[in-house]
């Protein structure tokens, strides 16, 4: 394989495939990494940038060297893998709780090791990228890089669609590296890389023997605890139990029956259960003679486990219809009305914490989602939430939101005898008519509702964050990460003899701005079409396709810089003035066209700006490295959404592009080569 274009496509495909693999695989084994999930993304960008720098000094080293830190990473992760139903104790800060009396602790040393080894592995895999970028005209190189990235996204999306295990993922990575091997005498680095990747495959085989299943979202383990009921753990966390309704101990999970006890004379002809899981909520509804149940579950593998293993076989009942979809998206699509709408245990089983990344249920616990549930109630219908909410302020927040949506505070049933209290929250016309509250139930006072934390909205969909802000542990971790990145980049540049004048502030800021713009697009489409894995994969592919379109335009027509910036700021203004909620129109085809125009137009013009500058650069590899390192800092800036929300993130993006324009005018360092 000698054609540089082919090698560039394969290198870029390998990098993006590996990045997605690590982002998907590591949190499935070490659940607390999921709370720092974009740290893996940031480390990946850092590693790619460092790899490009190092290739200036050692262009002869192939990508196999990245397999050595990858093996160390896999060994570290497996040796600290969380299986939380097994009693374990580790030192560190208590970070999340997931069931009665259990807690998981963050091992800071392991988290730091993960970041270090991800960076090292991605740097190794990126070593061929610098010479390949420098071997052809910049725009030609960039187009083949994007083609490879699209191939990497498509490959991993296909594996997710097929519910393949990590063994297949790592095997495909090995195949990608194998086809990049040059036909020449193997070096020591190549030999060690071969051996390391072989060891990775061996560890994946041993892990496969254990029998875990992998859905598009989770590592799933089916096990039998001491109480005898089959149970499901996701990413090592006990998640669901499959009890026969007739044998279920109501003191263990008391919330299932409460709405039926609250309204004993009411018949529910049609029920909607969002978060139906393996089927227990549905089985309980059927046991209370609910006429028909629409069971909505986002994870197809968990639902299939329920079909095969739930002792009551609720999904085999002709009264039950199953939909595999995001709950919010189902509410948007359906025109049906229901006598009972239940948001079952749809939120993740964690203590209050924050990440810059959306969770699967983020848009299900907003005022707009509660209003959508209300609008799908038949006359006299009831809306119910239940879960282990753990924090009183979270219950108060939901009470305030339901008061805003339904016009009266809900009825609440708590079970304080549990180590982590379970709570049932009910609203709707029949519930509002109950006065006074029955024994065991309560209705929050006006003062309690008024003092509750601010409601979550589609712009700030962060129910587990009490107040806007970034928690101290994230500030400390991000600071340490940036210091590590600064030292590593400076050291790598010095080792590779890359002069400071090769660094581009213009491309650095463009990278940070584009990462935030991409984040905003993903959030928009998650709201409009659901937080499913395939929506995200399609959005990423569409973003990359819009990049290719910009390259094609720039190759055939040298777009004036003023035109590119005017289009960019004009479309950013439109995106800011038309928030995603304004695009919630029917039919879905029209919604898709509007959303695509609003979300992808700024991306197109942003890439006209980038490609217009990139075609002028004298050092394509250094400019690309600057851009990738800027994207790493964009991953840090993403946490600003925890404070200002996702709509105002557009203003941050606009400010960064203004800064990029200024750096192009000032022409410091490598930006001297740019046209004014």
Question: Which residues are covered by each model-predicted region?
Answer:
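Alpha-helical transmembrane segments of multi-pass membrane proteins
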Residues: 1-676
């Amino acid at each position: 394989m000698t054609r540089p274009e082919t090698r560039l496509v394969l290198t870029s495909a390998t990098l993006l495939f590996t990045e997605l693999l690590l982002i998907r695989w590591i949190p499935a084994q070490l659940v607390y990494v999921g709370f720092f999930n974009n740290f893996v993304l940031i480390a990946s960008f850092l590693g790619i940038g460092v790899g490009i720098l190092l290739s200036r000094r050692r262009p002869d080293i192939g990508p196999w060297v990245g397999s050595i830190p990858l093996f160390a990473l896999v060994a570290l992760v497996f040796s600290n893998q969380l299986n939380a139903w097994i009693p374990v104790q580790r030192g560190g800060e208590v970070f999340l709780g997931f069931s009665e009396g259990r807690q998981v602790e963050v091992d800071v040393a392991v988290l730091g090791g993960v970041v270090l080894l991800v960076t090292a592995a991605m740097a190794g895999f990126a070593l061929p990228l610098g010479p390949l970028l420098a071997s052809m005209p910049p725009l030609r190189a960039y187009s083949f890089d994007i083609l490879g990235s699209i191939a990497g996204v498509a490959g991993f999306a296909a594996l997710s669609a097929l519910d393949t295990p990590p063994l297949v993922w790592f095997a495909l990575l090995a195949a990608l590296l194998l086809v990049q091997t040059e036909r020449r005498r193997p070096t020591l680095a190549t030999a060690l890389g071969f051996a390391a990747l072989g060891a990775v495959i061996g560890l994946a085989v041993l892990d496969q023997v254990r029998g875990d299943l992998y859905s598009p979202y989770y590592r799933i383990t089916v096990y039998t605890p001491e109480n005898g009921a089959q149970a499901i753990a996701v990413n090592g966390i006990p998640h669901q139990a499959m009890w026969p309704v007739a044998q279920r101990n109501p003191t263990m999970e008391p919330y299932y029956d409460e709405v039926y006890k609250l309204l004993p004379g009411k018949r529910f002809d049609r029920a909607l259960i969002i978060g139906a899981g393996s089927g227990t909520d549905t089985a309980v509804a059927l046991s209370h003679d609910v006429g028909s149940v629409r069971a909505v579950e986002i994870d197809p593998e968990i639902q299939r486990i329920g079909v095969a293993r739930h002792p009551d076989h609720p999904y085999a009942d002709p009264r039950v219809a199953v939909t595999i979809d995001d709950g919010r998206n189902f509410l948007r699509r359906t025109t049906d009305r229901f006598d009972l709408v239940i948001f079952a245990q749809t939120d993740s089983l964690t203590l209050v914490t924050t990440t810059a990344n959306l969770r699967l249920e983020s848009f299900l616990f907003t005022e707009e989602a509660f209003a959508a549930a209300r609008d799908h109630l038949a006359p006299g219908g009831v809306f119910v939430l239940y879960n282990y909410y753990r924090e009183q302020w979270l219950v108060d927040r939901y009470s305030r939101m339901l008061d805003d949506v339904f016009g009266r505070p809900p009825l609440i049933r708590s079970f304080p005898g549990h180590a982590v209290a379970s709570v049932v929250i009910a609203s709707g016309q029949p519930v509002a008519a109950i006065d006074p509250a029955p024994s065991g139930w309560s209705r929050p006072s006006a003062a309690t509702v008024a003092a509750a934390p601010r409601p979550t909205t589609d712009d700030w969909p962060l129910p587990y964050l009490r107040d806007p802000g970034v928690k101290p542990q994230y500030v400390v971790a991000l600071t340490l990460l940036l210091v590590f990145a600064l030292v590593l980049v400076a050291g790598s540049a010095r080792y590779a003899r890359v002069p400071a004048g090769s660094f581009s502030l213009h491309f650095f800021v463009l990278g940070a701005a584009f990462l935030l713009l991409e984040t905003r697009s993903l959030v928009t489409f998650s709201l409009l079409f659901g937080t499913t894995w395939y929506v995200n994969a399609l959005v990423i592919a569409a973003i990359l396709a819009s990049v290719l379109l910009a390259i094609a335009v720039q190759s055939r027509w040298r777009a004036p810089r003023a035109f590119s910036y005017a289009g960019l700021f004009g479309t950013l203004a439109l995106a800011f003035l038309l928030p995603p909620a304004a695009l919630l129109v029917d039919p879905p085809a029209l919604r898709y066209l509007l959303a695509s125009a609003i979300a992808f137009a700024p991306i197109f013009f942003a890439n006209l700006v980038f490609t217009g500058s990139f075609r002028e650069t004298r050092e394509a590899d250094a400019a690309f490295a600057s851009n990738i390192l800027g994207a790493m800092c964009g991953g840090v800036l993403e946490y600003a959404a925890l404070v200002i929300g996702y709509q105002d993130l557009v203003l941050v993006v606009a400010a960064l592009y203004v800064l990029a324009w200024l750096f192009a005018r000032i022409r410091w360092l490598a930006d001297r080569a740019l046209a004014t």
